[in-house]
């Protein structure tokens, strides 16, 4: 039996299931207790009761599962996550499980790659295979009896994984440098600076051809655009012209000017133009005599008597 790197004073958990032979389990526990000594501890736990046992987090240095000779244990994702939880940071998990070498759809037995992925997803690192070997006749019989699985392409895979040296949610102080950084400017290459420098003398030098920006424009570019051409295609369509909200094409101003012209043209006009000022400015024959002054354009109704008198 491999010692799995167990030393004195360590806490070890041994996981077994109904396929584990009792005598083989007892022999394994005795050997582990001899390795851990009086300061260490070996705990034996049934895999079906592991989740209900409520072991404290980070309780064990080593977890062994399915290692008992003759055992054919299958490990679910929940079981693997619980094993990772009870491991101390830096602790190791060793497990053995029958794996399928053929491609079988919806198989309860994992392939080797899927088993490695399951350990990684449970939170373990440095996952690697340790040993592959054929199943013994007793193990093949155990798979059929306890797992109800029949296949001629099974192997026994021993695999290990390590818990990271930190707990989930733990914090660590960052070592930040508080030394004042030099604010010196980078050195400038004189040759490069001279290359990109254009002096006033160069500007007046006739040998230097400078492009006149106005020459880049043709007569068409200098024409003032027609406001109608700037209007949106759908602006003002329909029987009633109406400017859009936040109009920017000029239709709103155009409609406002048309409205002002209509108001001016609709205002009543008099011959002298002074009727609205009051009687002091009205003609002798003005029909508005005797009426108070009014604003220009204000609608004033005249009675029939006033019209006949006028």
From Swiss-Prot:
* Superkingdom of the source species: Eukaryota
Q: Where is this region: Linker?
A: 173-222
Provide the residue span(s) of the region labelled N-terminal SAM-like domain.
6-172
Tell me the segments the record calls region Fe-S binding site A.
Answer: 235-249
Where along the chain is [2Fe-2S] cluster bound? 235, 244, 247, 249
| Short motif (Cx2C motif 1): ranges | 272-275
Residues binding [4Fe-4S] cluster are: 272, 275, 283, 286
What does the UniProt keyword field contain?
A: 2Fe-2S, 4Fe-4S, Apoptosis, Cytoplasm, Iron, Iron-sulfur, Metal-binding, Mitochondrion, Nucleus, Phosphoprotein
Q: Does the keyword Metal-binding apply?
A: yes
Cofactor(s) of this protein: [2Fe-2S] cluster; [4Fe-4S] cluster
SUPFAM superfamilies membership? S-adenosyl-L-methionine-dependent methyltransferases
Tell me one GO molecular function of this protein: 2 iron, 2 sulfur cluster binding
Where can this protein be found? Cytoplasm; Nucleus; Mitochondrion intermembrane space
Q: Report one GO cellular component.
A: nucleus
Q: Give the record's family classification.
A: Belongs to the anamorsin family.
What this protein is reported to do is described as: Component of the cytosolic iron-sulfur (Fe-S) protein assembly (CIA) machinery required for the maturation of extramitochondrial Fe-S proteins. Part of an electron transfer chain functioning in an early step of cytosolic Fe-S biogenesis, facilitating the de novo assembly of a [4Fe-4S] cluster on the scaffold complex NUBP1-NUBP2. Electrons are transferred to CIAPIN1 from NADPH via the FAD- and FMN-containing protein NDOR1.
- Subunit comment for this entry? Monomer. Interacts with NDOR1. Interacts with CHCHD4.
Listed name of the protein:
Anamorsin
The species this protein was found in: Bos taurus (Bovine)
Gene encoding this polypeptide? Answer: CIAPIN1
